[in-house]
Amino acid sequence: GGKSFVDSLDPDGVDVLVLAGDIGVVKGGSLHRGFDLLATKYRGIPIIFLMGNHELYGSSPDWAEEQVDALTKDHPNLHWLENNTVEIGGQRFVGSTLWFPNLPDGQNTRFSRGLNDFHLIYDFQQWVYDHNAASVEFLTREVQPGDVVVTHHIPTVQGVHPRWLHDVQGFGRFFLSQMPDDVLQRPKLWFYGHTHDSMDFEIGGCRFLCNPFGYVRREENPRFNPKLLMGV
């Protein structure tokens, strides 16, 4: 289970641990158990965390957010980012789950029938589009040169692995939210998750990194680097 993910990590030389979501499910306690393990392994080290879509499975967004807010009070080194900014050691971290928009082609409803998010998260459909719009507005306003940005969903089509590019107008529309070019080029580093393929590329002066473990029982990403360290 998730213990294999935690066991794979090496805290040596780490000043800040960044987790871009899908760490566990709030309902049922797997997220809480994961952070009990992480808080022990990274004792005294700040942990930047944001929720992915899996954290919300089996619950409503409002209820899950209340539980995560309480979780941060149990672990003082845990910093939950959701349309907010935290500064650690003089470095700004700006974060948002981000989600995905209701595309103007009117096809979201048709494709949504195949996405677990719409079936396993309560009170989701209108919430997700409103939340995405608020997140895009927040990041557009908040991100400054030199920032480190963390999102769960992919912020640009360039961050989609080539094997999924054929589907970005289909089911893949729920993987990303295309941010404006000027926002993408503003920070120096942008971490994201959601996809289970490692990615590393640049847009303007910003480096984009995705380093996912993937589903723990499938060992599906052989390129996952448990010792990935980025200097900022």
Residue ranges: model-predicted function:
Residues 1, 90-99, 148-152, 207-213:
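Active-site-proximal beta-strand elements of phosphoester/diester hydrolases
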Residues 1-5, 25-29, 54-64, 85-87, ...:
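Active-site environment of divalent metal-dependent phosphoester hydrolases
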Residues 1-50, 55-63:
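N-terminal active-site segment of His-dependent metallophosphoesterases
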Residues 17-22, 48-53, 79-83, 148-151, ...:
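Active-site neighborhood of phospho(di)ester-bond hydrolases with catalytic His/Asp-centered motifs
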Residues 27-30, 63-67, 127-138, 171-178:
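Soluble or luminal CAZymes and related metallo-dependent hydrolases
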Residues 46-119:
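A basic- and aromatic-enriched beta-loop-alpha substructure that forms the phosphate/nucleotide-
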Residues 94-170:
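Active-site-proximal loop/helix segment associated with metal-binding centers of metalloenzymes
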